């Protein structure tokens, strides 16, 4: 373990982080730990699972710890990662933007049901937050303005 002369592994750090975040009352502590460590290591979640026995460098731990501390204080994972997926598209998010919510995807699904391809020529998105609705509708209805 850490401090005994051996670098901690991905598995060990994820276990410690999950426990810490659980104590702090964070939502989805395991998922939070995985997403944050994957970000630091430049991996997706599958890559992280495949790297469970990989030791972590001091530099990687130094990049991870501040993110975990911020998550422990309640900061949303999306802000820590700087992005959030919405309807298959990645959006940049900061504390200055609203985080796209999964239930908002229902609006896009409903628009796709109501308007056959080519039928929607104009739409407006007011108070856009992250802009996820307008961008996603523009992708799904490229002829619309």
Predicted regions and their residues:
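Short, glycine- and charge-enriched coil/turn segments that flank and shape catalytic ligand pockets
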Residues: 4-7, 54-63, 113-122, 143
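Conserved AdoMet
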Residues: 30, 37-113
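Residues at secondary-structure transition points
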Residues: 8, 31, 98-102, 125-128
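Conserved SAM/SAH cofactor-binding pocket of Class I
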Residues: 105-145
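N-terminal hydrophobic or amphipathic segments with adjacent small-residue motifs
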Residues: 19, 27, 68, 76, ...
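Non-catalytic accessory regions of SAM-dependent methyltransferases
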Residues: 1-49, 54-56
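Short, polar/charged, Gly/Pro-enriched helix-capping and turn/loop motifs at alpha-helix termini
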Residues: 24, 47, 78, 118-121, ...
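A general structural signal for well-ordered alpha-helical segments in protein cores
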Residues: 14, 33-34, 64, 77, ...
């Amino acid at each position: 373990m850490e401090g005994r002369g051996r670098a901690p592994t991905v598995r060990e750090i994820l276990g410690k982080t999950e426990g810490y975040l659980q104590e702090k009352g964070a939502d989805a502590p395991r998922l939070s730990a995985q997403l944050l460590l994957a970000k630091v290591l430049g991996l997706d979640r599958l890559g992280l699972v495949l790297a469970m026995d990989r030791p972590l460098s001091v530099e990687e731990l130094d990049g991870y710890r501040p993110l975990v501390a911020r998550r422990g204080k309640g900061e949303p994972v999306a802000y820590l990662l700087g992005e959030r997926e919405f309807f298959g598209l990645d959006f940049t998010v900061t504390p200055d933007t609203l985080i796209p919510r999964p239930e908002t995807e229902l609006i896009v699904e409903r628009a796709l049901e109501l308007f056959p391809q080519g039928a929607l020529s104009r739409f407006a998105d007011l108070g856009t937050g992250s802009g996820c609705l307008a961008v996603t509708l523009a992708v799904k209805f490229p002829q619309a303005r």
